[in-house]
Every structure is written in C-alpha cells, then in structure tokens.
Amino acid sequence: MLRLIALLLLLPAVLRAEVYLFDAPSGAVTDELVIYSTLDQRLAEPLIAGFQAENPGIAVRYEDLLTGDINARVTAETDAGGVTADFVFSSGMDLQVKLANDGYARPVRVPQAAGWPRWANWRDTAYAMTFEPAVLVYHKPSFPDGPPLTRIALLDYLTAAGDAMRGRIGTYDIERAAVGYLFLARDQEHFADIWSLVRAMGAANVQQFPTSQQILERVSDGRLTLGYNILGSYAADWARSHPDLGLVLLRDFTVVISRVALVPRAARRPDLGEAFLSFFMSRAGQTILAEKLRLPAVSLEVSGSNSAQAMQAALGPQLRPVAVSPGLLVYLDQAKRQRLITRWHRTLEGR
C-alpha cells in the first residue's frame, strides 16, 4: 500500500519534499529503502512495485524533491556526519556528477555494469539510466506539409514567416529550467549558427516556460505552433493522448540527456541502495522503465522502440548523448553560466 506520509519543509534550507511510504508487500517489514528522487511518485510506482515483487520484505520511503534540493540534502546530511538516502535518482545530470566527483557517492559494481555503455557510467559511481532526446514539437494542423527538419530549416522558416510567427514558438526559460540551459549549452557546442537561430526566435517573440507541460499544452491546442528543444520523453507521452501534437528529432543533430542514479557514500543502508540500483539496471527494471514509465532505456538488453539501442540503430551519429563525466561540471561554473544567460537575453532582444 502507498501512503503519502508527509509534506516536509526541511529547515534551515527550507527544502520541500513530498514523502511517500510503499509498505512491504509481505506485511512484515524487515528493511526500509530510502530514495531521494526527482521522478514524480506516480511514475515511480511501477518501478518500486517491480523491486518489491522481488524483495517483498522491503518497504520503500520515497522522497520527491527538486534537483537542487537533492544535491543540498545529500551534501548537508553527509557533511553533518549523519546518514542520507540509500539511493538517489535525478534529472540533474550535472549535480549528480558533482556529488560523485566530490566524493558523496560510493562505487557500486553491480553485475549489469559490465554491459553498460561507457558514456553512461562514470567510475561505477554515477550511472545514466534513461536516454532522452531533445525534440522539436509542432502543431500538426499548422504544418500540413510537415515541420522544419533541421535547425537551418527552422531558421529559414522563422525568417520567412515574419510576423505570422510572432508569439507562436515556445521553448524553456533557461534560467528556471535546468534542462533548457543544458540543451542550449550543448547546441552552442554542436551548431555554429545557434545564435542566428536564437535571434530569429527573439524576432518571433519566443515564449519561455519553466516546464515541458506548459509548452506541450499550448502546442497541442494551437496557441503555439512550435516548441524548440523539448524533452522528448514528455513530448512522446503527451502525443499519445493529444493527436494534434507532433514531434521530430532534428536531423542535423539531436542532443540526448539522461537521468542519473547513484548510491550515496553516507547511505544508511548502502546494501539496499545497491540492490535497487541492480534491479533498476536489470532487463526487468529497464523494461519497466521503457514500457510503463515510458522513459527510454539505456540498457543494451532492451531493444524495443523505446530504448537507446533502437534509437541508435535508426539514427546513428545524429544522436549526441551527454556523457556522464566531469565534463558536465563546466555547466555549474557560475561565471560561464551567467555569460551564456546574458548572451541568450541580449540575442533574443536583437542586440
């Protein structure tokens, strides 16, 4: 049985956490696994159910937190000499790698690690678990002949459309949406004309939003006709129930990001954290991820359409996955971050 047991405001940091308890299926609790995660509890339920089916004596305490709050809690609890979560799963790739790089994660060599892609494993301390591309979403009725398929084509389309596209394209607010900032930073590395595209979006009065849902809602009902650099896993899920929403992986290149898992060094029960990681990386766990959570699986043992293997077979070098490595730490450099944000705003304003 699942119970919402608390809505915590954790002082002094004033971090907000929704805390859920998944009772042990056996009815006789022998252990409790503690998870900190950015994944919505509703999405996490099938994964936890699969783990508990194999481990019926284990209850799960699931704390739903923001990416920055997870980093702050693990750091603060470890530095205080106490214990922290047994397992951490976050969409904040850079912050997860920072925890591992700074010594807050323990090396875990689960059996599945031997077959894990090299880019998705950093020193057995941080593992990519999903494979999520950035996509262009579009309002199908507005594009009877199909949407732009490359960034150059998108630039040409916005330039030619002029005032007809004013206020009709959306993207993430890169100051409030970490994924939007990461996608822009990677675009800058792969696409020499990115700032020409940003200038064209600014001329079209691009609308900026902190969440994927706000963009997807507006594109699916036609208030927007395009959404740039949207997280593909959410877009694909939304498109299943909104037939007017289309999506395309731009053909010049497609940035792919991942949600990252680790077992903290100060875990209260590291053995339970390792057991959950092992299940998550197993064929069974990754199949649940792909089929029930609808998040593309990294494991090479999963070959269905919602997997890294299938996407790589179909798209090859078009895909540019972000490696789990200290290279991500550059995106946490505050001076560099501010320079990119300043350039973004100035370019949107046509300066």
Short names for language-model regions:
Residues 118, 131-133, 197-202, 208, ...:
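Periplasmic-binding protein-like
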Residues 3-13:
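Bacterial N-terminal signal peptides
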Residues 17-97:
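Early extracytoplasmic/lumenal segment of secretory-pathway proteins
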Residues 322-351:
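Conserved C-terminal helix/tail region of periplasmic/extracytoplasmic solute-binding proteins
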Residues 34, 38-45, 83-85, 90-223:
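Extracytoplasmic ligand-binding site segments that recognize negatively charged/polar headgroups
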Residues 264-324:
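Mature extracytoplasmic/periplasmic domains
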Residues 137-142, 183-185, 257-272, 288:
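A bilobed periplasmic-binding-protein/Venus flytrap-type ligand-binding module shared by bacterial periplasmic
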Residues 94-98, 220, 224-244:
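A ligand-binding cleft/hinge motif common to bilobed small-molecule-binding domains
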